[in-house]
Regions:
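Contiguous surface segments at macromolecular interaction interfaces
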Residues: 2-45, 58-61, 69-135
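Short conserved beta-strand and strand-loop elements enriched in small hydrophobics
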Residues: 47-54
Length: 135
């Protein structure tokens, strides 16, 4: 029998620091919001998300592992995620108004930090508008 040749490639997963409104971060940390929604997909493969609670809190409060990333029309993604979206249908469709693509990060292994951290702990001097890569 001839031996099979193959190439094994490790897919490197990046960590993303995501700026999120404090109330939505709280829903994630409480387990009420299982998906984080975005309008576009980053270029890098994301394996972990660090949560920065934006103003007025302005602290890094937790993290989660990304189980999977869903991409599709806003209507398709809502039909899959609505039961654990942690946001209202009106808010969701308002967010995606005029957009043809929706991205949803399914979160698992969510951790709330016992002591919130500063952005400077991650070598970051300014809060990201949306997100930044940490590695």
């Amino acid at each position: 029998m001839p031996s099979k040749k193959y190439y094994e490639r490790e897919i490197l997963m990046s960590t993303m620091l995501l700026s999120i409104k404090p109330e939505f971060v709280e829903y994630i940390l409480e387990g009420k919001k299982k998906y984080e929604f975005r309008k576009s997909k980053p270029k890098e493969n994301i394996g972990r998300i660090i949560f920065y609670a934006s103003s007025p809190q302005k602290q890094v409060v937790g993290e989660a592992t990304v189980e999977t990333i869903l991409e599709g029309s806003p209507k398709e993604i809502w039909s899959i995620t609505k039961s654990v979206a942690g946001i209202t249908k009106n808010f969701y469709f308002s967010y995606y108004e005029g957009k043809h693509m929706a991205v949803a990060y399914k979160l698992k292994e969510v951790i709330r930090y016992d002591h919130p951290k500063a952005l400077s702990d991650y070598g970051v001097s300014q809060a990201p508008q949306s997100f930044i890569y940490l590695d």
